[in-house]
């Protein structure tokens, strides 16, 4: 009958509305993670890129005490906003006018005068192929050819240019093919993302290890990678939801970690106060748990605290101790707890009749001048050390499977300390008269 609404019309309308609202609530189509060459991000539009899985978000932000604007990446799901990457940290936008776009096959951030304040600075042979910028599920912001998803052929990626944070799957260290050195630089302060005073960099001479720098001065040394952890960070214990890896080959020397449970957020960060630390999110109370922080001890973790041929022990008084068979170089200064001069041998080495003292649970000495041979074990390492009159100490390069590889020191021994547990065995060469 004309003008009479049939009962199933209402049912159909209600069903349609229900489906519509469900789509609004749960459909991920509203979270866009790509930027094409015809699009842009503007501060005024309040648009952001959101990674698949909604873990990370890229957009513009300003800190609590500043009117300056930055382009950055943060955790999407956390109410306590935590920034993991900042593009223009040392060249902020002075006001709320800023645009991110693709121009000339480069990502470019423009200010209010349309002048570039940050760019990927790429030079490409073929500029005819369209490019796209994409925020990946792991927080990596990449630029690639629009038809090529191969990670090995990204034109540019934020993971190659970290700020103060190392995320899972990021690499810290050298790409030997390109010469790129990936390192961390702290924020100026907790509310200022500009480059701070501290940096954390890999030193690749001999046996690779990381150094914490305060400007041009080394403050702490990680110790070399021993197959499980860095020998100077014994607090970094194996976790069930995380896998660590250190790669050293002809193409790269780099540290990375990955999560076996991607629902857990964990990161390494260099704080504005100069602490390198492992932080993992605790969702039940909404804070970042600090698993460890390095340096831990203000004395024993300080670079070359005790001078050559001496080691630092937190359970001894004073904390600096000469190695067995050594005496303080300047006993008066030593008694005044001025330890920079270190220690000297009691008895000169004879070369042919020397032996070794075993020091347990040690942070290995600085390795920049050490000799490494990963093909031999500890017994052969001892023989090789004894056959070299310049050898002063030796140790395993890898502590797994009972110990493998050989590290030999032929100069002075610097920056050592001992631990209650999880250190390494170090064998120091002594004259027979000094062996106990």
Curated annotation (Swiss-Prot):
It holds the Pfam family B_lectin. Glycans are attached at residues 46, 64, 114, 121, 245, 261, 390. Residues 1-31 form the signal peptide. Stigma. Residues 351-431 form the PAN domain. SMART domains: B_lectin, PAN_AP. Disulfide bonds join 381-406, 389-391. SUPFAM superfamilies: alpha-D-mannose-specific plant lectins. Keywords: Disulfide bond, Glycoprotein, Self-incompatibility, Signal. Residues 34-156 form the Bulb-type lectin domain. InterPro entries: Bulb-type_lectin_dom, Bulb-type_lectin_dom_sf, Pan_app, S_locus_glycoprot_dom, SLSG/EP1. GO terms for biological process: rejection of self pollen. Involved in sporophytic self-incompatibility system (the inability of flowering plants to achieve self-fertilization). This is S-locus-specific glycoprotein S6. It comes from Brassica oleracea (Wild cabbage). The gene is SLSG.
């Amino acid at each position: 009958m004309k003008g009479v609404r049939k009962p199933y019309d209402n049912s159909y309308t209600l069903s349609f509305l229900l489906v519509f609202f469900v789509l609004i609530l749960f459909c991920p189509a509203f979270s866009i993670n790509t930027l094409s060459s015809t699009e842009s991000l503007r501060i005024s539009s309040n648009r952001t890129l959101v990674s698949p899985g909604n873990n990370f978000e890229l957009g513009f932000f300003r800190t609590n005490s500043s009117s300056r604007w930055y382009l950055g990446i943060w955790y999407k799901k956390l109410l306590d906003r935590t920034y993991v990457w900042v593009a223009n940290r040392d060249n902020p936008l002075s006001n709320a006018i800023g645009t991110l776009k693709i121009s000339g096959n480069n990502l470019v951030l423009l200010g209010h005068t349309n002048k570039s304040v940050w760019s990927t600075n790429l030079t490409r042979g073929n500029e005819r192929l369209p490019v796209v910028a994409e925020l990946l599920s792991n927080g990596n912001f990449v630029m690639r050819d629009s038809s090529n998803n191969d990670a090995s052929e990204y034109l540019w990626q934020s993971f190659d240019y970290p700020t103060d944070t190392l995320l899972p799957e990021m690499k810290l260290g050298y790409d030997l093919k390109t010469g790129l050195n990936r390192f961390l630089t702290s924020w100026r302060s907790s509310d200022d993302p500009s480059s701070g005073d501290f940096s954390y960099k890999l030193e690749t001479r001999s046996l690779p290890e990381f150094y914490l720098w305060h400007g041009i001065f080394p403050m702490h040394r990680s110790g070399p990678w021993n197959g499980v952890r860095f020998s100077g960070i014994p607090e970094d214990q194996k976790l069930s939801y995380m896998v660590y890896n250190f790669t050293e080959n002809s193409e790269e020397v780099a540290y990375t970690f990955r999560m076996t449970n991607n629902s857990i957020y964990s990161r390494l960060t260099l704080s504005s106060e100069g602490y390198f630390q492992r932080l993992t999110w605790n969702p039940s109370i909404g804070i970042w748990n600090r698993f460890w922080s390095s340096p831990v001890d203000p004395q024993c973790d300080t670079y070359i605290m005790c001078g050559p041929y001496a080691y630092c022990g937190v359970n001894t008084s004073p904390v600096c101790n000469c190695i067995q068979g050594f005496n303080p170089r300047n006993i008066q200064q030593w008694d005044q707890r001025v330890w920079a001069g270190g220690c000297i041998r009691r008895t000169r080495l004879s070369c042919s009749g020397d032996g070794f003292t075993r020091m347990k649970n040690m942070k290995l000495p600085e390795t920049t001048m050490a000799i490494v041979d990963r093909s031999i074990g500890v017994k052969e390492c001892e023989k090789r050390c004894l056959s070299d009159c310049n050898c002063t100490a030796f140790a395993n390069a890898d502590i797994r499977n009972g110990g493998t590889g050989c590290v030999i020191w032929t100069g002075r021994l610097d920056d050592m300390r001992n631990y209650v547990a999880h250190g390494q065995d170090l064998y120091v060469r002594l004259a027979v008269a000094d062996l106990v």
